[in-house]
């Protein structure tokens, strides 16, 4: 019976000591994996940031092209309706109420002086 107790005690001590070693190895392995995972996350984050910056640059470029092409005229030509409070008629033109043939429009138009 003493032999069984000694054997059991020996197996128990070996299991505990090897279990501790495995626990330490597992802890170190997990730390290595988390550090490796952080480096992968940093890499993925940098890659995503680069893609977003490229996309933003393209969008800003399109906006600048769009604003260049869709620029409003700075003055209104002859015979075009205008606002009496904010006349934008070109030089040599005046924003006046139409006479005779344009009375029914009830609007102001750019006419030559």
Curated annotation (Swiss-Prot):
Tissue pattern of expression reads:
Expressed by the venom gland.
Annotated compartments: Secreted
This protein's UniProt keywords: Disulfide bond, Ion channel impairing toxin, Knottin, Secreted, Signal, Toxin
Q: What InterPro entries does UniProt report for this protein, alphabetically?
A: Toxin_22 (IPR012627)
Q: Which residues make up the pro-peptide?
A: 22-74
Output one GO MF annotation.
toxin activity
Disulfide linkage: 75-90, 82-95, 89-110
**What's in the GO CC field?**
extracellular region
Q: Does Signal count among this protein's keywords?
A: yes
Q: Any idea what this protein is called?
A: U11-theraphotoxin-Hhn1a
State the species of origin. Cyriopagopus hainanus (Chinese bird spider)
């Amino acid at each position: 019976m003493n032999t069984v107790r000694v054997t059991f005690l020996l197996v128990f001590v070996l299991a505990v000591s090897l279990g501790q070693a495995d626990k330490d190895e597992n802890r170190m392995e997990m730390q290595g994996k988390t550090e490796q995972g952080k480096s992968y996350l940093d890499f993925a984050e940098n890659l995503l940031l680069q893609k977003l910056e490229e996309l933003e640059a393209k969008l800003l470029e399109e906006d600048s092209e769009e604003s260049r092409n869709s620029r409003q005229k700075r003055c209104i030509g002859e015979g075009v309706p205008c606002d009496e409070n904010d006349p934008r008629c070109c030089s040599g033109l005046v924003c006046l109420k139409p006479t005779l043939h344009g009375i029914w429009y009830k609007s102001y138009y750019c006419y030559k002086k």
